[in-house]
Amino acid sequence: MAVGNNTQRSYSIIPCFIFVELVIMAGTVLLAYYFECTDTFQVHIQGFFCQDGDLMKPYPGTEEESFITPLVLYCVLAATPTAIIFIGEISMYFIKSTRESLIAQEKTILTGECCYLNPLLRRIIRFTGVFAFGLFATDIFVNAGQVVTGHLTPYFLTVCKPNYTSADCQAHHQFINNGNICTGDLEVIEKARRSFPSKHAALSIYSALYATMYITSTIKTKSSRLAKPVLCLGTLCTAFLTGLNRVSEYRNHCSDVIAGFILGTAVALFLGMCVVHNFKGTQGSPSKPKPEDPRGVPLMAFPRIESPLETLSAQNHSASMTEVT
């Protein structure tokens, strides 16, 4: 029910947010936790060839020894788009030229009799909430792919340490399905079976593309033509270099990184285009009046002027009719 031109009353927005949105978000976070921190989902044991050169790369060490550690990656992934959204929304709300268009797209929601949700708060919660949901959803997709495929990392044979003197490894072209042939550290071997798709590549491109879509859709700069392209391309380049780092350190195959890029891109495009509608307001742009159909416009009536030829023709026709009768 509308209250004013820029205010709309809604009794369902708060219950929907608490009992629907937060429940879905909590379930997504819980599922991501089970994939990351528990052994609920067992990794598929994939076979290998004992003399496979693609799996004999040197062991690069634990993830904490990588050039891009998981802690740094997750902090940057979460903080960068969130900071961009906060800065962008606050700037647009307090700049007069952009505030008018923002208020035209978003109405202030009145919940109950006293609580107002202004457009600034609604947009920040919407965009950051969707981003967080997509981040956990991407993590779930990646973990599910790694668990189902059990694709081996480039350094798998280095940490597996198979018994090359056994009968199974004597033949160069014999495929080994027995996972018990490995003699290395079981925990390291378990992580070496989770290569496809690359988690670093998927999460980094998702975060970078989501931030890029927000910048290009909402931030308007009339004085500079290169500020937005430099910021967007720099963000995407960082994600691209993150994937290349995984290949250079022999932690993932090229195909793993490409699959991660495709997965993260798909999630970001879906959420950005279909869920937040290119970061536009829920009211949309004000509708323009439709032009009148020219066929429906009444014509101006003019007095009829009878020509002399028509008068003479009518007289001749009446005379001929009289003769016939």
Curated annotation (Swiss-Prot):
This is Phospholipid phosphatase-related protein type 1. One of its GO terms (biological process) is phospholipid metabolic process. CDD domains: PAP2_wunen. Glycans are attached at residues 5, 163, 316. It comes from Homo sapiens (Human). PANTHER family: LIPID PHOSPHATE PHOSPHATASE (PTHR10165), PHOSPHOLIPID PHOSPHATASE-RELATED PROTEIN TYPE 1 (PTHR10165:SF41). It is a multi-pass membrane protein. The modification Phosphoserine is found at residue 307. It is found in: Cell membrane; Cell projection, Neuron projection. One of its GO terms (molecular function) is phosphatidate phosphatase activity. SUPFAM superfamilies: Acid phosphatase/Vanadium-dependent haloperoxidase (SSF48317). Belongs to the PA-phosphatase related phosphoesterase family. The chain crosses the membrane at residues 13-33, 67-87, 127-147, 201-218, 230-247, 257-277. Its main location: membrane. May play a role in neurite outgrowth and neurogenesis.
